[in-house]
Amino acid sequence: VGVFLLSYSVPSCGRSVEELGRRLKRAVSEHQLLHDKGKSIQDLRRRFFLHHLIAEIHTAEIRATSEVSPNSKPAPNTKNHPVRFGSDDEGKYLTQETNKVETYKEQPLKTPGKKKKGKPG
């Protein structure tokens, strides 16, 4: 035990153990900082790429119509096409009741009374 305490308090290579610990903590925090910085740069590049891609998608329809007939009227932004999701039965049943023939029966409310106690032990 005495040798351990002496070796622990004696500086190694001119540096104390506390200084080495601080250096290690600083290295870890610098590594984390660089990692976070790289992550934010990557996120910024991804956002820029998606923004550029979305801008191309929004202008693709205008470009396509202008290439086909340059003198014609541009297509309106709003379309009156009916959009359908799902089937006609969608609003009739709850998801748990799909394909059930029985109708819903109300169950009697429980009256407040004795509560079950857990088993001791």
UniProtKB/Swiss-Prot annotation:
Similarity remark: Belongs to the parathyroid hormone family.
Biased composition (Basic and acidic residues): 99-108
Alphabetic keyword roster: Calcium, Cleavage on pair of basic residues, Cytoplasm, Hormone, Nucleus, Secreted, Signal
Pfam families, A to Z: Parathyroid
ATP-binding found in the keyword field: no
One GO term of the biological process aspect: bone mineralization
Subunit relationships: PTHrP interacts with PTH1R (via N-terminal extracellular domain).
Region annotated Disordered, chain positions: 61-121
Motif (Nuclear localization signal): 98-119
Gene: PTHLH
Residue ranges of the propeptide: 15-24
Taxonomic source organism: Ovis aries
Name this protein carries in UniProt: Parathyroid hormone-related protein
Main location: secreted
Compositional bias (Polar residues): 66-80
Role description: Neuroendocrine peptide which is a critical regulator of cellular and organ growth, development, migration, differentiation and survival and of epithelial calcium ion transport. Acts by binding to its receptor, PTH1R, activating G protein-coupled receptor signaling. Regulates endochondral bone development and epithelial-mesenchymal interactions during the formation of the mammary glands and teeth. Required for skeletal homeostasis. Promotes mammary mesenchyme differentiation and bud outgrowth by modulating mesenchymal cell responsiveness to BMPs.
Cell compartment(s), UniProt: Secreted; Cytoplasm; Nucleus
